[in-house]
Amino acid sequence: MLGFSICLYSCNNQKNGMTSYTADELFALQDSALQHTSEYSDTITIKYAQGLQVDYRPDGIHVTISNPDPKASHEVKEEILVTKPCNRFICTTALQLGNFEVLGLEDHIVGMNSLKNLFSPQMKKQLKNGQTVQIGKEGNFDLETVIASRPDYIFVSASKHGGFEALKECGIPLISHHGYKETHPLGQAEWIKLIGLLTGETRRANAVFAEIEKKYLTLCEEVHTATEEQGQKALPTVISGRQIRDGWYIVGGKSYMAQLFEDAGAQYIMSSNEESGGVNLDFESVYAQGIDADFWQIDGSFDGDFTLEDLAKEDERYATMEAFKNKKVLFCNFSQTPYRELAGVQPHLLLADFVKAFHPEILPHYILNYYKPLN
């Protein structure tokens, strides 16, 4: 796991009420927020993200970055002193790209690594015209290209290890982006405020996040109002994941996905699990608990359309599950949707997908974005 501290680095500042949504909602949200940026403060306040701390002092803005995972409390925290805006960054994950994309700041990205399942039209354009360069793949970065792109910072993922030490030796500060480790959906999205701080676009970041937060909390309230008379026992049940190697890989009971299930008005079968990330459990144990669940959430990359028949081929026992028999398996295909890029900054759309499945009467006109029932 990466553990390093950035004490001080100054940039060169070189120029370079919910009804229905579609995938284009991202840009409508962005435009709506940016039209009202004057209503928002330039000061960043962190409300949900456990891995970010911002402190305004006379010498600049002190940002402390840590791993939100409670089990990672021993890791070294990263300290950044922001004294002026930066506009040249390298991203090494799709989620990092999405943080810039939702703010309309893709032009600040001068380098990317893997281009697999890249959805951003703007990033494809920048890669084609040379505004953004490919820096190689994890474990085999092209260090000459990295240095030539003159980045102010390189965002890295603490879950990946290959080649990052070599990047560090280039003398360019690395920043761990722990957004994916946050246990609250709004905590994941709030990492866009870090981008706002580094680029000097704090007002923009505050405005966009406020729109995301408003949509998420408004829908939460609608779900609560619609379901409070039903009682906990009347809520639909949901199981997650499927067999990976020798066990059943589920999302932990304290994960952001478990929080989404709860906010969408469902009971997560594995809610008593204390893990905040994914966990591999005994297949038979999860199967016994999940066989009668009303819904089943799974995801993965699949070329073409993934079907119930394809799922049953993985393990014939899947076909005996109630969610399978009732065609209530909710699947997100990473090869066909920009989940890895944008889901982390669109928690309101993830929530709406599940609300549409669990309580369709609340969102009768909603168009699904990420999770759709398998046929």
Residue ranges of each PLM-predicted region?
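Bacterial N-terminal signal peptides
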Residues: 1-7
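Bacterial Sec-exported substrate-binding components of ABC uptake systems
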Residues: 11-97, 204-239, 305, 312, ...
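A short, structured surface patch at a secondary-structure boundary
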Residues: 56-73, 82-147, 153-159
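Stable alpha-helical elements in mature extracytoplasmic
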Residues: 85, 96-99, 105, 142, ...
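Extracytoplasmic substrate-binding proteins
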Residues: 131, 148, 152-247, 271-272, ...
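A ligand-binding cleft/hinge motif common to bilobed small-molecule-binding domains
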Residues: 159-169, 300-312
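Alpha-helical scaffolding within the catalytic cores
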Residues: 214, 218, 280-285, 312-318
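Flexible, glycine-rich surface segments
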Residues: 221-308
